[in-house]
Each structure stands twice: as structure tokens, then as C-alpha cells.
Amino acid sequence: MSSYRLPKRGLVDRNVPLSFTFDGRPMQGLEGDTLASALLANGRMLVGRSFKYHRPRGILTAGAAEPNALVTVGRGGRAEPNTRATMQELYEGLEARSQNRWPSLAFDIGALNGLLSPFLGAGFYYKTFMWPAPLWEKLYEPVIRRAAGLGKASYEADPDAYEKSWAHCDLLVIGAGPTGLAAALTAGRAGARVILVDEGSLPGGSLLSDTATIDGKAAADFARDTSDELRSMPNVQVLVRTTAFGWYDGNVFGAVERVQKHVREPASHLPVERLWRIVAGKALLATGAEERPLVFGGNDRPGVMMAGAMRAYLNRYGVAPGRTPAIFTTNDTGYTLAQELEAAGVDVVAIVDSRPAAGVDYRGKARLVREAVVCGTKGGKAISAIEVHHGGRTETIAVDALAMAGGFDPIIHLACHRGGKPVWSAEKAAFLAPGSLKGLEVAGGAAATTGLAACLGEGAARAEAIVRELGLPCPPVAVVKVESEEGIRSPAPLWSIPGIKDKAFVDFQNDVHLKDIGLAVREGYSHVELAKRYTTSGMATDQGKLSNVNAIGLIAKARGVSPAEVGTTTFRPFYTPVSFGALTGAHTGHHFQPVRKSPLHDWAKKHGAVFVETGLWYRSSWFPRSGERTWRESVEREVLNVRKNAGLCDVSMLGKIEITGSDAAEFLNRVYCNAFLKLPVGKARYGLMLREDGFIYDDGTTSRLEENRFFMTTTTAYAAGVMNHLEFCAQVLWPQLDVRLASITDQWAQMAIAGPKARMILQKIVDEDISDAAFPFLAAKEVSLFGGALHGCLFRISFSGELAYELAVPAGYGESIADALLEAGKDHGIMPYGVETLSVLRIEKGHVTHNEINGTIVPADLGFGKMVSAGKPDFVGKAMLQREGLTAPDRPQLVGVVPLDPQQSFRSGSHILAKGAAATLENDEGYVTSSAYSPHVGSTIALALVRNGRNRHGEEVLVWSGLHGESTPARLCNPVFFDPQNERLHV
Amino acid sequence: MASLVPCPNCGRRPKEEFTIKGAALSRPEADADSIDWFDYVYLRENPRGAYEEYWHHTSGCRRWLVVARDTVTHEIAACCDAAGRARSEARK
């Protein structure tokens, strides 16, 4: 079947055959092929089914704009749907599958949609599936989604690696065609730092499929020699297989490099794709031009191809597009193709030229039909004939391929990514890049310059000017001599063609045809943005690279205005689809986010801790012992043991901030709502930090270790936020204060030693006297351990309500000190306990956490109203705390809740309803913020924020959870369930 | 996607290193009118064009900066240390 491969011609290596499969069928291609060229060489015309009508589709282009030849490449986690066969380099063993067909590509049931097409026009689903509404989600959408679509994503994990990189340069050249190569060479020789990117596998762009000679060399050889010279320069980086997909502020360009998408088994030491962010002093857009399709009946039939694509398959890949091709052209480039086909031994059946006369003197064998158009095609899964409309009649000519040459549209996407709108040029009959772009220039085909010599010259001249702007000396630019047979590109666009009967496609990928555009205009959707959304023209993976200008031209014609008046839709990144893998980079799996482990993590693990993830931290949750069947049993044992003997808990993850400076006390006085200025040295104090809106931000204890040195603790979750906030206060609000802040969370291992026997255990390792007299409640100071072997900080603070201390030691000593404390307390019954027990202990004591400090709570709501300093002239939140809404009597207030029946339970998040009240939003009295089973009380206990709760102790309420269908009669009470007189703290 | 912030301490750095607080407003005096406080805490301009914001170089020098940027083009016109500006305003 490989009979379409020509014996000579092209850049493919006929000595290196490559085996691949398409829909399971084995085929052969050559080194240097794309999947598309290999399929064509195998005579494969039909490669896909269209989006809506499931029409047979072939290969339309030879590049990035391909709307039809989308296939799934690879298998398992490497399966990549919607791969453009025109961009996929062939490799040995490549597996490709066609998409959007069932049961097979050749026999596709979905093609029945074609019969329904009168009902499937633009906006059909807006009109058709309106009623009954519930069917939309259940029936219409699933059915439509199955019928209309592209490839399917793999559900398996991607086994490959991706990475991100930054690059910096003086000049970024986008596109390594004639313009880009000439520019890069000029700037590179002048010594500028140049990055040249091209989406193709080889630098050269159109040179690779051009038969011209440059300085006596074949165009492709010129491209190779030029890129070789560029690669030899230390100041030049050439990135192939790299698509610049976006232009962003700061002249930063996004680009994706497909490092290993052209190999069967990616090497594990390299990424498969690399996302570049390129910071460019200047950039030159040398992306060339896209050939414009012609809109005639059946222009989507396999075998119809862009003329430039046919040139590429012929000259670069050595593949004949057919044996009896015809050419439909509106300009002279069609004749160049005809001559090249004939030179390759392929006889052109006919050249259909829309103009009365050509600009070139064609002397080939093809029949010339002037002032004529192709208005239709015939054939099943491949073209068999064209219908030529000329002189008022229609003639059928048998062909097996058709090239269409409809003129050229500059590829200006990137130039429009920062808000600039394309400008219609009547002279060039094309949309050009917006003028006066900062940092980006457009040259060559992208600026509607035509002709090889002109592009080479323009690329060099623009680079020279940029180099001079950079202040570098620029050696004289060598003028190259070009011999080319390419005809001049005629600007006259051909929007509409007479005599069309079959569907004439405007947007191939979305199955939008001529009549859809007309319908949109008739129904009032003639604004280009509305027409796009109503017809879907210009959407999906190709983003209308081929269709947009034709759609605009047709709308303009229907409205009787110039395309300038219609304008374009908005160009946004990405130019072509970028994989999620590339955007994610290395942030997958366990690299998705960092893991934070306390310095006591290994100690906890050694003692059998069960860990829980809280934010980035792994915290020891409880420490099961043999014989315990549930976590509740372990937690109850730990709770009772703390109340009876002593427990040791890792609290290292609390945020710790050291605050120093001669104004440190004044600073704390301003960031906390309670007073800190006169906190004595050697004392700790509980502090409440507000936001400027008056609500509580965070809480914690802060100790004055020296006159001008404080040790602050924050909650675990808000540690980073508090640090940022304090820095804001110190730098922006009060820069005149002498204060220094340092995050010391990671420097200290901190452990709570709580329980009636805490002191006698701790005293065994602490050198100083820590009796109640010498070291009373809220004492805080640096202590010496083991006879001066180590120093730490000791705080007599208690979250559990017991006699308790927190000991901070340098992080690296954490594990040995924790072990030493367990050893010291062995005879006193010490046990490790985790955050579950910590939580039960604090709920029993009515201590709050961020469950209660939920961002809508002020100090008075928690019973801390008297803590707020009335005397301080200023603190964060002072002004707004006075608002009437924040002092209203019906504010939510902290209360305790217990079930009437101790056997019953309820959970956090449940709502509080007055007894007998219906469960409505208006009757909502508040909600349960924290709950736990309390071994001390012998039932579930909870904290809740309840409207006017402080005055409702003793009231019977209903705890209701609609989510779980639970309602539990309960009683509001004092939130302190254990030792309300705080006697145990002061022993 | 990839704007660069010219940090006065660290040079041009990617925006991912920064966190943005919002409008660079001056805090009212403690005894200012409640209207001023409402403005400061809740009300924001939403200009199309030039805008000054507090940015924190969280993963860099940890300084708070005043970034003057254009909300349309994202171009940054100026970037200075917020403390320096606050001090010079206090002198006025």
C-alpha cells in the first residue's frame, strides 16, 4: 500500500523504515515522517470522523492548524487524545487510534447524524432541548456528549515527568522559517543573547518544503546550515519542538517544549515536556502565514487539502497526494504547486483559477479552467470528482485529490494576547497585527510580507535594528541570492462561491458550515462574538486557525460591510493546546505539596502514633496500645491518664515567632487587643489578635523572656499568616517602631507535659526549681537541663486544665528529651497523647480553637470582653470593634451543650433550635462548633455558638442535623465542664 | 501568567513568590471618624488602569512593597519598599 511514496524527494530517510499501527493495522513509514505523512504514504485518506455529523475526514494541513486529523497516540497512562497527526513525529512502534467513531472508522453509526442535519444547525440545542428541563441533565446532555466529541482522556496516571524552566534573552525569535532564521543569524553573529523557538522538529519552516535555492543551496540545506551555525554559537539557544503559546506582561513568553513526545519509551532522566517562561528584551514574531481554505460544497471530503500542505507532503516528505490531483486556486501559488507536482511525476488533472488571468506563465500539462470555481466534490470516504462551476454551467472532473489555495492569513495570535486587536488591511486582504506593540515586532509572512527573498531580507533587517537598539555593533548583513519559482500571492479573497449544493464547511473541527453562518446573521447573532458562540465556529482545540477569517468574511458579506467592521474575536493564550502535565510540571504525587513533619515525628512514630494530616503537617493523633479496638478506647485512656497521672504531647507545630527590639512590647500592645506593655519579664500571657474589622484573627500565648525579647506562639494553621500580618504591621503600619521578627517554628521541638504528676517528672531533668512558688502558673523562662547539658524554654501554661508545662528544646534534641521525659515519668504513669486527646481535654475546659474563632466572632462572644483593653490608644481592630452590630445582645456566644440523655450523641456542625421550634433558617439559634465524648462527664459534650447563649444556660434545646437526619434533645450549659474554679492549674 | 515584579531588594522575581494584600491604603488614625474606618476596611476603588497595591515578597526578602501596576495591561510602573514610603509620608 506504500505506493504514494515517491522514489526520491524530501527529507525522509528511505533507509530507516519505521513500523506503526493505525487502528491496529500495521503500516510502515520513514524516519522524518509525521504520522500524517506516513498515513498518506500508505494511501490512508480517511483518518477521522467529524465532531457533529460524523462525516469522514482526512488530512487537511501539514501543521499546527490541523482541525481534522486528530488521533489518540499511545496507550495506558501515556495515551494522548486529540493529537494532531500533522504534528506527531513518527517513531518505531507508534500506536495511533482514530476518534469519535463507533463501531469503527469506516462504518460509523454516528454518521446518521448527517441525515438529521436539517435539525442540527447552529444553536439547535438551544432551541430543541428546552423542555422538559429535567431531561437536560439526565438524557440530552449525556447523549449529545457521547455523540459529539473528540478523544477520550486516559484514566490512568501519567507515568512521565514534566518540568518548568525560565530563560532570559535579548531577542526571542518565534518561528524558525526564513524570516526567523535570518533574524536569529543576524542577532547571533552580533553577539546578542538569542533564543530561537520553532514548533517543528527541524528548523526551517517553509524552507523545508520549498524548491527554491538560496545562495546556490537547496532551501532545506540552507535551513540546515543556518541552524547548525546558530547552534554552534554560545549566545544562541535553538529550541525545536517548542511552541510559543502566549505573550504575557513583562515581555514574558510561555512556551512548551515537547522533549520526548517523538520517542516510544521516554528516557527517565528527561522530562517528556518542558514548560518555558522566556523573559525577552525584545521578541520577533516570525510565525509566517496560514493558508486560507475555500468554502465550497464537500470541501471536507478526504483528499481535499490545503495547497501548501500538499507542497509539504510532496517536497518535504516525498509523498504524492494522489495520482490525479486538481488544484483550486485564487492566486499564483497554485501554479507553483502544479509545477512541482509535475516535476515529481504527478500529473495535475486541472487547475481551477477563480481569476480571469494568472500572474504567471504556466506551461504545464494541466488543463486550465479560468474564471471558474470548484463548487462541490463527489465521493464516499475519499474524493472521486470535483464539480467545476464556470460560464454558468457545472462540469464534473474525476480527481483523487484536490488542493485549495485561498490566500494567506498572517499568524498573529501572540501579538494579540495582550489586548491588541487585529487590523484589517484591505490592501493585503488580511488581518494584520495591531500596531505599536511594546517589546514585540512582527516580520515576514506574519506581517503579510510575501516572497522568500523579501522575508529573508526583512528578518535580517529587523534583527539588525534590534541589535543596534541593544547597543551592540552589528556586522554588515550578507545579502542572499534567491532563486524561486513561487508565484506572488494574490490578495483578492474569495468568500463565497456560486453553485454550492452540499455542506460547505467554514469550521471543519466544529462542523460549522456556510448555512450556519447565514442562520446566525438572520437570527440576529451577526456580532462576531455572538456568531462564534451561536455557531461554535472558531472554538475547540484548533481555535479557528483556519476558519476565523472565512467566518468573518462571510459575516461581512451577509451584512454588506467590510471585514474591518466585523472585526475578530479575542485571541487568548494558548496558541495550541498545552497539556495539563506541562502546566503542572513536577508538582504531582507526593511533590504536589510539601510535607511538614515535627521534630518529634519519629519519636511519635516510635511510640506507635496514628498520624493525621492537618494542613501540611502530620500530627500524632493518638497512640493505640495492644488490646484497644477503637480509637475511642485509646483516646479515653489517654484523657484519663492526663487527668490522673501525666501525659506528653507534641505541640511543635504551633507557630513560634521571636520578637525583639526596644519597641517590641509596644508593638505587641498594638497587635493584640489585650495589654502587653507591662507584661513582666518571665511571664506568659494569653493574647487575642484581631483583624482591622474587629473580628478575632488568632490567639496564642506570648512570653517575655527578656525586657526586649518575646516568644510568641500562634495556632498551627495561622502560623504563616500571623507572621505575614506582623511583618505588615511592623513595616507598613508602624515602621518607626524598633522591632524585629523571626519565625522560629522549625527551630524548636515543643512538648506539653500535663497532669498532676507533671512537675515531679519535669523536675528530674530541669535544673532550676520549678515548684509552684518558684515557677507559678504563667511563668516563662529559659531553663537549663541535665545539669547544664542543654538549655530550653519552659512555660507554665495549660490547654488541658491540668498542672501543665510546655518545654521547648532545640529541634535536634526533641526526640531524646521526649524519651528522657518518658523515662523520668515511667514510674509516674506518663503516656504520650495525641491531638484527639488534646481536643477532648480542651473541650472539657471550654478552651477555644479556630473551630470557635471562625472569622465572625469578637472577643465578647467568647467571654473575653473584659480582656479587651479599654485604655490602649490604638490596636489592630480597636476602631471597628465598637460597631453596634458587634456589641448587640443577640450575638452568638460561646456555651456548652450536653445531651439530655447521656446515651445520645450529636456531632459538630449540628444546628441549635429552640425547643419545639421548626427547623427553618429563621429559627436557627447557632451551631455546635466542637464536640467530643468526655470520660469525665460521661457523655458527649460540646461547645456551641448560640444567640445570646450566655444568658441561656440551663435551657433545653434541640440539636439538629438535617444532613444526617438527626435531632437530639440537649441542654445549654456553662462551657467549662471540668474544674471551673481552675484549682488544678495552680497546684 | 508570568509577570515579573521588580523587587527593590531582590531584583525582578516571578510573581509566584509574592502575595497580594490589596489596595495600598494609609491606615486612619485610631480616633478617626468611623466613616474613614469603614472606607479603609471595606471600600475599594476598582480602577481600570493605574492601581497601587501592597505586595509581600513572601518567598523572598519578606518585605512589604508598594507595587504600582496597570490593571489592564498588568505592566508594573513602580515598586518600592512600603516602609520607606510610610516613613516619608509620616514626615509630610
Swiss-Prot record, chain A:
Complex and partners: Heterotetramer composed of subunits alpha (SoxA), beta (SoxB), gamma (SoxG) and delta (SoxD).
Natural source organism: Rhizobium meliloti (strain 1021)
Keyword Cytoplasm: yes
Enzyme class: oxidoreductase
UniProt subcellular location: Cytoplasm
Task of the protein: In the presence of tetrahydrofolate, catalyzes the oxidative demethylation of sarcosine to yield glycine, 5,10-methylenetetrahydrofolate and hydrogen peroxide. In the absence of tetrahydrofolate, catalyzes the oxidative demethylation of sarcosine to yield glycine, formaldehyde and hydrogen peroxide.
Binding of NAD(+), residues: D198, E199, S206, A244, G445
GO cellular component: cytoplasm
Protein name from the UniProt record: Sarcosine oxidase subunit alpha
Pfam families in alphabetical order: Fer2_4 (PF13510), GCV_T (PF01571), GCV_T_C (PF08669), Pyr_redox_2 (PF07992), SO_alpha_A3 (PF17806)
Single Gene Ontology BP annotation: tetrahydrofolate metabolic process
Bound cofactor: record note: Binds 1 NAD(+) per subunit.
Keyword Nucleotide-binding: yes
InterPro entries: 2Fe-2S-bd_N (IPR042204), FAD/NAD-bd_sf (IPR036188), FAD/NAD-binding_dom (IPR023753), GCST_C (IPR013977), GCV_T_N (IPR006222), GcvT/YgfZ/DmdA (IPR028896), GcvT/YgfZ_C (IPR029043), Sarcosine_oxidase_asu (IPR006277)
EC number: 1.5.3.24
Reaction equations catalysed: sarcosine + (6S)-5,6,7,8-tetrahydrofolate + O2 = (6R)-5,10-methylene-5,6,7,8-tetrahydrofolate + glycine + H2O2; sarcosine + O2 + H2O = formaldehyde + glycine + H2O2
GO terms, molecular function: nucleotide binding; sarcosine oxidase activity
Family: Belongs to the GcvT family.
Cofactor(s) the record lists: NAD(+)
Predominant location category: cytoplasm
Gene from which this protein is expressed: soxA
Gene3D superfamilies: 2Fe-2S iron-sulphur cluster binding domain, sarcosine oxidase, alpha subunit, N-terminal domain (3.10.20.440), FAD/NAD(P)-binding domain (3.50.50.60), Probable tRNA modification gtpase trme, domain 1 (3.30.1360.120)
Keywords: Cytoplasm, NAD, Nucleotide-binding, Oxidoreductase
UniProtKB/Swiss-Prot annotation, chain B:
Single GO BP term: tetrahydrofolate metabolic process
Reaction(s) the record says it catalyses: sarcosine + (6S)-5,6,7,8-tetrahydrofolate + O2 = (6R)-5,10-methylene-5,6,7,8-tetrahydrofolate + glycine + H2O2; sarcosine + O2 + H2O = formaldehyde + glycine + H2O2
Keyword Oxidoreductase applies: yes
UniProt main location, coarse: cytoplasm
Residues binding Zn(2+): C7, C10, H57, C61
UniProt entry tagged with the keyword Oxidoreductase: yes
Compartments reported by the entry: Cytoplasm
Alphabetized Pfam families for the sequence: SoxD
Gene3D superfamilies: Folate-binding superfamily
Coiled-coil stretches noted in the UniProt entry, renumbered to this chain: none
EC number: 1.5.3.24
GO cellular component: cytoplasm
Keyword tags: Cytoplasm, Metal-binding, Oxidoreductase, Zinc
GO molecular function, one term: sarcosine oxidase activity
Family per similarity comment: Belongs to the SoxD family.
SUBUNIT field: Heterotetramer composed of subunits alpha (SoxA), beta (SoxB), gamma (SoxG) and delta (SoxD).
Annotated function: In the presence of tetrahydrofolate, catalyzes the oxidative demethylation of sarcosine to yield glycine, 5,10-methylenetetrahydrofolate and hydrogen peroxide. In the absence of tetrahydrofolate, catalyzes the oxidative demethylation of sarcosine to yield glycine, formaldehyde and hydrogen peroxide.
Protein name as it appears in the record: Sarcosine oxidase subunit delta
Organism: Rhizobium meliloti (strain 1021) (Ensifer meliloti)
Gene: soxD
